[in-house]
């Protein structure tokens, strides 16, 4: 075999690898950088995330999933899913009620313990903040984990399901905070 054929033979696997990575990046996974404090303490500004774009083509959106969605033409936001289509949402005395039943939010406990009065979320009903009694079909209701400082569905309303980029699969930076579970 000539040296030229050997070189071509070594380039082929690299070409295939680059094509596979580019395809995965374009259609399956995306990198995101967290900007701001709205998802603290779960996610912090500067965290690097991998978002699975196919998650909701394969399975359903679940309450408490952390998602990335197109907020407008220029910005994507990362928030937590609180309300699914058909849900009635309310907060009273810092407790989440979905369809009239208390729902525990264990991911907020560490943050609540740091607060002076232990209260993270002000009282509201879905109707008070959106004018609707239920989350409409084809929409979700999202909140940031830092409820005191988050621009979320309480301010901009429902997120259409077709605005969702994907589900946050894991945080890979900083490496000491590497996590699959949120």
Swiss-Prot record:
One of its GO terms (biological process) is signal peptide processing. Keywords: Cell membrane, Hydrolase, Membrane, Protease, Transmembrane, Transmembrane helix. It is found in: Cell membrane. Residues 1-13 are cytoplasmic. PROSITE patterns: SPASE_I_1, SPASE_I_2, SPASE_I_3. The chain crosses the membrane at residues 14-30. GO terms for molecular function: serine-type endopeptidase activity. PANTHER family: CHLOROPLAST PROCESSING PEPTIDASE (PTHR43390:SF1), SIGNAL PEPTIDASE I (PTHR43390). This is Signal peptidase I. It comes from Bacillus caldolyticus. The gene is lepB.
